[in-house]
Amino acid sequence: MIGLCLGLAGAVWAQVPTPVFTLAWTHTIEKVRWEEDYRVTPEGLVLGEARVKGSGAGMEIPHGAELREGSWHYQRQLPPLQPLRLGRTPEAGDYQLCFNQQCQWLSAWLGPPQASQPAVELWGCELEVASSPRPRTF
């Protein structure tokens, strides 16, 4: 079964058994929520729709975006991302990973953001058997 792996430089820290997810975060300066929907494929993470509740420093709304229910909705045609690299520091706050109609902070899988480990990568992977104690599967 394909799922989502979290880690860095190919080292798997955690596995999430979902074929689709939303990555959400709050912009550090503008304090505006941003969400991106992804589909997990063998080729990588395919970005579907993205939503942002406003605009500001470094977050210009793309041409063709539609304002619906208080958020700008848009789609970009990008090749699959394998891996998707995220900056993750205590100062910037954490990301949320949403699937099965629930959102959890990445810290639920990885512990809190740390200055000594300022990045994490997400990629599509074949999930390991649940009997293996590491990496964790939730």
Q: Which residues does each predicted region cover?
A:
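Hydrophobic beta-strand residues in large extracellular and virion-surface proteins
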Residues: L4, L23, L45, L97, ...
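Short acidic, glycine-rich loop/turn motifs
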Residues: L6-L8, W25-I29, F99-Q101
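Secondary-structure transition/turn motif
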Residues: G7-G10, E49-K53, R76-P80, Q101
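Mature, soluble, non-transmembrane domains
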Residues: E60-F138
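Short N-terminal edge-element motif at the start of the domain
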Residues: M1-L6, V12
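N-terminal secretory signal peptides
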Residues: A11-P62
